[in-house]
Amino acid sequence: MTDKVKAVPDGFHTVTPHLTVRDARRALEFYQKAFGAEVLHVAPAPDGKVMHAMLKIGDSFLMLNDEFPEMGGDPAPSANGGSGVTLHIYLENVDAAFARAVSAGASVKMPLMDMFWGDRYGTVADPFGHKWSLATHTRDMSPEEMEREQEKAFAKMPKSA
């Protein structure tokens, strides 16, 4: 009798991001430097491009590959001016991680700041067109506390037309 294979393999979460990039080998180096990623597997295509790569950042997996338009694959976000998707990472020390990401080549989209929802938070764009938000949770709050803090924060914001 055969054991049933798990639908979600050990170590995976239900949702796993899979990124398409231009120059996946350079992206692998960037994610290692910027986010401390561990490269678990790289499957090269016959032409040397990366068909599939598996990385681990903290307790989560990230998959990526080079563009393969000749196989009907999607273009990298850098081909279209960016992506509407943001990947979020919780870290023990967001200040150090943010500095590492910028040092590795990320551009700052929103500088780090203490947010009304209890996180120290900022956003960067990687050199491959993907956006990342980085945070350290600094304060647990009840829904009522968060609502009060949100009202205070929004009261300070400029009004849109």
Labelled PLM ranges:
Residues 1-18, 28-29, 35-125, 135-161:
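Vicinal oxygen chelate
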Residues 21-25:
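Short acidic-aromatic low-complexity motifs
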